[in-house]
């Protein structure tokens, strides 16, 4: 039977092999196998069985310094940290001088911070002093004016060096990038659209593995790249508040995203998400969740736990029904449900009494429930591109409504209650079936834009002259032959009429 690391581990666990023999067999695999995964697993098992012999240390030291595979060097460094931390300094010095792999450099730096000896601190101080990046050096000079460099612990210094390594690597790959630092640590990082700056082989199609080292990062912008997945390690971004992943190709989110409990802004628009993890409800600080233009057909019930959420954008998904509860989402003031497959306004929306903006355009609504009038805080209501034949009388009770878009429906009239919409500024009735307008439309004294494009109007009520705030009147594609003379006074005041 071919020797395998799993078999060695099993035989050692069953006491078929003693520790010395198990170590020798694992070393044999590491040195002789052509199976990379078997070599990696053998190195890891050395840590699991606490193989703290000198021969093992020499092997790991040699792997760290000279193996051609980055993953082998990285794994060797991890095992040295776990088993040989007290003697790790010398091989780590070599890594600092000669290693080019970012992952290995970051791991070595992290280990040095944990050693916390005079020698490791000296190595880190020298590394900080050798930083030539002008922007980082300037930030560090300000930091060291407030506090002597010698007063920093090895761990604090290692974080500064790690952040420098990361910026250096990013600038090498993508050229100039945008970032902000505070006290030597990156707090804001903009990698949006970096793939367009460089040749194809350096496109950003994987989530940057170094992110776990950016423990002070509060803003990360990765929009307009080619990411397809988010790793579980996203949970390590404990300081993140602003996270933009829009315009990528992300198909799913890990459960660990729920660990980002101070995250306020999450933008995932224009991805390929088909579902959300239930852990999304654990984002207790979230105020902005943008899921526009994905492939969602449902929402998890845990969405109701987002009590601080102010904006939820679900425009352009595959939603037909919302079988969730929004009770408790008292902060939600903007809900976008446009361009879905909704035939009936979901009853769960009724509980959202703080809504100021409700987007329902581009659905299959043929009727509105009377409770639409219960949204007393609503300022903008978008119902364009549906199948509405009439509006409920209750719509006139939405006293704060300022914008109402109803273009491309099947409306022939407006309810009399409409004249109570005294704050209405924008009314779009284009591409409906109106043959006339009610005389009371002149009571909408706040109206600034009235769009009537593409109806069957032959005349206009004289009461339109009372709309002294009107700035734009669109009459294109109707049957009106001449502009009524009573509108001339409004034109003199600046009214623009499109006809």
Residue ranges and their predicted role:
Residues 2-17, 37-52, 62, 71-85, ...:
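Structural detector for internal amphipathic alpha-helices that build alpha-solenoid repeat scaffolds
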Residues 17-30, 51-64, 85-97, 117-129, ...:
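Amphipathic alpha-helical scaffolding segments comprising HEAT/armadillo-like alpha-solenoid repeats
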Residues 19-20, 24-27, 38, 43, ...:
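Terminal domain-start segments
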Residues 25, 29, 45, 59, ...:
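Charge-rich, solvent-exposed alpha-helical interaction surfaces
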Residues 34-35, 68-69, 100-101, 132-133:
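Short inter-helical turns and helix N-cap capping residues of alpha-solenoid HEAT/ARM repeat scaffolds
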Residues 69-120, 237, 241-252, 256-270, ...:
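A generic tandem-repeat structural signature
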Residues 130-223, 228-232, 241-244, 251-255, ...:
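The feature captures the LRR N-terminal capping module
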């Amino acid at each position: 039977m071919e020797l395998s690391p799993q078999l060695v581990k099993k035989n050692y666990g069953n006491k078929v092999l003693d520790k010395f023999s198990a170590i020798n067999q694992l070393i044999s695999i590491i040195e002789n196998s052509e199976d990379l995964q078997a070599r990696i697993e053998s190195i890891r098992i050395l840590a699991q069985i606490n193989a703290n012999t000198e021969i093992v240390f020499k092997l790991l030291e040699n792997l760290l310094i000279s193996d051609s595979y980055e993953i082998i060097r990285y794994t060797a460094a991890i095992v040295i940290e776990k088993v040989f931390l007290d003697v790790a300094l010398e091989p780590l010095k070599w890594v600092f001088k000669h290693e080019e792999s970012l992952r290995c450099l970051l791991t070595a730096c992290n280990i040095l911070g944990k050693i916390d000896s005079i020698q490791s601190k000296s190595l880190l101080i020298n590394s900080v002093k050798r930083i030539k990046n002008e922007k980082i050096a300037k930030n560090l000079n300000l930091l060291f004016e407030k506090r002597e460099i010698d007063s920093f612990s090895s761990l604090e210094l290692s974080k500064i060096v790690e952040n420098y390594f990361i910026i250096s690597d990013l600038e090498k790959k993508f050229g100039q990038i945008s970032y902000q630092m505070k006290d030597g640590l990156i707090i804001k990082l903009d990698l949006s659209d970096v793939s367009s700056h460089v040749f194809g082989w350096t496109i950003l199609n994987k989530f940057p593995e170094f992110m776990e080292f950016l423990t002070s990062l509060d803003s990360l912008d990765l929009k307009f790249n080619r990411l397809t997945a988010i790793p579980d390690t996203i949970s390590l971004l404990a300081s993140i508040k602003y996270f933009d992943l829009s315009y990528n190709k992300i198909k799913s989110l890990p459960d660990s995203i729920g660990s980002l409990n101070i995250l306020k802004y999450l933008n995932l628009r224009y991805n390929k998400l088909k579902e959300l993890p239930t852990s999304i409800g654990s984002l207790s600080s979230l105020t902005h969740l943008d899921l526009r233009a994905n492939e969602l057909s449902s929402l998890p019930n845990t969405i109701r736990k987002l009590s601080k959420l102010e904006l939820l954008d679900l425009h352009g998904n595959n939603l037909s029904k919302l079988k969730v509860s929004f009770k408790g989402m008292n902060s939600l003031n903007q809900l976008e449900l446009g361009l879905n497959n909704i035939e009936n306004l979901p009853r769960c929306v009724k509980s959202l009494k703080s809504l100021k903006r409700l987007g329902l355009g581009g659905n299959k609504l043929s009727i509105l429930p009377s409770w639409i009038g219960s949204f007393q805080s609503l300022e903008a209501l978008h119902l364009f591109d549906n199948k509405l034949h009439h509006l409920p009388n209750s719509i006139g009770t939405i006293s704060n409504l300022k914008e109402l878009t109803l273009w491309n429906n099947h409306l022939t009239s407006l309810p009399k209650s409409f004249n109570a919409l005294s704050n209405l500024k924008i009314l779009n009735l284009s591409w409906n079936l109106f043959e006339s307008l009610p005389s009371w439309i002149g009571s909408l004294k706040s109206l600034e834009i009235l769009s009537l494009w593409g109806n069957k109007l032959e005349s206009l009520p004289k009461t339109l002259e009372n709309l002294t705030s009107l700035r734009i009147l669109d009459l294109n594609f109707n049957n009106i032959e001449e502009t009524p003379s009573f509108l001339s006074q409004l034109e003199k005041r600046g009214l623009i009429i499109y006809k």
